[in-house]
Amino acid sequence: VLSPADKTNVKSTWDKIGGHAGEYGGEALERTFVSFPTTKTYFPHFDLSPGSAQVKAHGKKVADALTLAVGHLDDLAGALSALSDLHAHKLRVDPVNFKLLSHCLLVTLACHHPAEFTPAVHASLDKFFSTVSTVLTSKYR
């Protein structure tokens, strides 16, 4: 459960990211594919080469979903219900992949915003991404 301090840290960080969320989402997704090659299996129809427009576009979708989540921190399950259905029933993404992408998102954000990436912010973002991952995998059961 996100504490009030966590929610403040997440919202504040997301505000600082601003218009770069899509760019960072693409970078994090590319980092995930490079660092964890098994994640590529869900994207056989994508050009997965560095700088791929398809990877950038999907990264923007990831960032848009996270932006939606940031706007609904008190109702993540409701806000992400359709995405949870999609990933559980249609795409059948292995839940571990959400953890891998979350890690790569943290690395990407730390690279771009080192001064703001304090231990408290790191912990809050980690809890946020973990909570989002839990919501996205909740319909697997």
UniProtKB/Swiss-Prot annotation:
Residues recorded with modification Phosphotyrosine: 24
Gene Ontology MF annotations: haptoglobin binding; heme binding; iron ion binding; organic acid binding; oxygen binding; oxygen carrier activity; peroxidase activity
Record carries keyword Phosphoprotein: yes
Domain of life: Eukaryota
InterPro entries: Globin, Globin-like_sf, Globin/Proto, Hemoglobin_a-typ, Hemoglobin_oxygen_transport, Hemoglobin_pi
UniProt keywords, alphabetically: Acetylation, Heme, Iron, Metal-binding, Oxygen transport, Phosphoprotein, Transport
SUPFAM superfamilies: Globin-like
Modified residues (Phosphoserine): 3, 35, 49, 102, 124, 138
Location of N6-acetyllysine modifications: 16
Chain positions found as Phosphothreonine: 8, 108, 134, 137
Any single Gene Ontology cellular-component annotation: haptoglobin-hemoglobin complex
Residues binding O2: 58
Residues that coordinate or bind heme b: 87
PTM annotation (N6-succinyllysine): residues: 7, 11, 16, 40
Domain Globin residues, every copy: 1-141
Tissue: Red blood cells.
GO BP, sorted A to Z: hydrogen peroxide catabolic process
Stored PANTHER family: HEMOGLOBIN FAMILY MEMBER, HEMOGLOBIN SUBUNIT ALPHA
Family in the record: Belongs to the globin family.
Function noted in UniProt: Involved in oxygen transport from the lung to the various peripheral tissues.
Quaternary data: Heterotetramer of two alpha chains and two beta chains.
The protein's name in its UniProt record: Hemoglobin subunit alpha
